[in-house]
Amino acid sequence: MPREIITIQAGQCGNNVGSQFWQQLCLEHGISQDGNLEEFATEGGDRKDVFFYQSDDTRYIPRAILLDLEPRVLNGIQSGPYKNIYNPENFFIGQQGIGAGNNWGAGYAAGEVVQEEVFDMIDREADGSDSLEGFMFLHSIAGGTGSGLGSFLLERMNDRFPKKLIQTYSVFPDTQAADVVVNPYNSLLAMRRLTQNADSVVVLDNAALSRIVADRLHVQEPSFQQTNRLVSTVMSASTTTLRYPGYMHNDLVGIIASLIPTPRSHFLLTSYTPFTGDNIDQAKTVRKTTVLDVMRRLLQPKNRMVSINPSKSSCYISILNIIQGEADPTDVHKSLLRIRERRLASFIPWGPASIQVALTKKSPYIQNTHRVSGLMLANHTSVATLFKRIVQQYDRLRKRNAFLEQYKKEAPFQDGLDEFDEARAVVMDLVGEYEAAERENYLDPDAGKDEVGV
């Protein structure tokens, strides 16, 4: 029985990435731009109903809710080539249409105003599912809507659907290039909700995405469309085991359980290979892709979609490689042995040091230039370095009291700036949790007692 997943897209980034994701899913399942099954799509064996439902006229409609506080991106989707696949009742544009002005407080306060309408949509989709497993939430944490309205919705969804899983795909800002000066404020406040209200967070950051696109396509300035295409490739690859189910990892809880042994350390990194012309136009085709080649490349830092600074003690908590295409299980076994012999991945001292592998088929409707492709979902302790950078940048702004006036105008800060202090404490605790996970006594109940007050 399929376990359905409802996708919620919030803000400019969430909707741009989401629209690419739905295009990709339509291509993979042989669904036309108006939601009808293409005549050649007769293979079967795929579960379309995890992400789509069928309307009375048998068209496939995404289980998607598209939210934004300003109209530009959603208007673009409503007039774009795939405009007819969405349920028009599932678009929500804020009444004023002025957006959240890159202010987390404005986005969060807007949540209070719009929650009734938005949760009507979410409830309607949930009631239309036979066996809802959870939600996929797409947003960026730097602006106002994705971070602020996103935070509000994550809190409320947790209260409203306590037994359903929430998996987010969260785009982090490039911490080196501050296109929005208040990024660190918005990111820190959103990070608190990602820590407390999500079951699993796939961390993608603009710096790494741009670097990978620039590297593969030999372009100086990658466009957002190219980086969004990359994110949608990761999303579609990370859901292949749900859509082409095997006997393992065929639902969201199976994937999350295999990657997240302790509830707070639920931030995942991704790598994907090979980037060829199928994923991004103009990418150079690599010659021969073997399972070993793919698995080795997945472990290379340059293929990671997150800018992190691993230290000597950084290690993997868990790894799941999703291998698509013509992969022989004996090749997989040999590749794992080779990786272990060469010590290409170092694991935590308190858990199993194994790479899990899920083999899935590729869509029969898309012509591929490579035999095998792979996505790595990994839980790695060095993700904490990204969170530390956000806190350091936040501290620099806060020390100068920079731009605080515009936050004080918003409802969440009417009674003071405690919201900031609480968020900082939550993120620092999370950093501490990942650092503790690098030690052997991590699971010892008395561990860390001597270190309090360091």
Curated annotation (Swiss-Prot):
GO process annotations (BP): cytoplasmic microtubule organization; meiotic spindle organization; microtubule nucleation; microtubule nucleation by spindle pole body; mitotic cell cycle; mitotic cytokinesis, division site positioning; mitotic sister chromatid segregation; mitotic spindle midzone assembly
Top-rank lineage group of the source organism: Eukaryota
Residue spans crossing the bilayer: none
Keyword Membrane: no
Sites where the protein binds GTP: A142, G143, G144, T145, G146, S147, G148
GO molecular function: GTP binding; microtubule nucleator activity; structural constituent of cytoskeleton
Keywords assigned by UniProt, alphabetized: Cytoplasm, Cytoskeleton, GTP-binding, Microtubule, Nucleotide-binding
GO cellular component, one term: old mitotic spindle pole body
Compartments in which it is found: Cytoplasm, Cytoskeleton, Microtubule organizing center, Spindle pole body
Main location (coarse class): cytoplasm
PROSITE patterns listed in its UniProt record: TUBULIN
Family: Belongs to the tubulin family.
Function in brief: Tubulin is the major constituent of microtubules. The gamma chain is found at microtubule organizing centers (MTOC) such as the spindle pole or the centrosome, suggesting that it is involved in the minus-end nucleation of microtubule assembly. Interacts physically with beta-tubulin and is involved in microtubule function.
Protein name: Tubulin gamma chain
Organism: Emericella nidulans (strain FGSC A4 / ATCC 38163 / CBS 112.46 / NRRL 194 / M139)
Gene of this entry: mipA
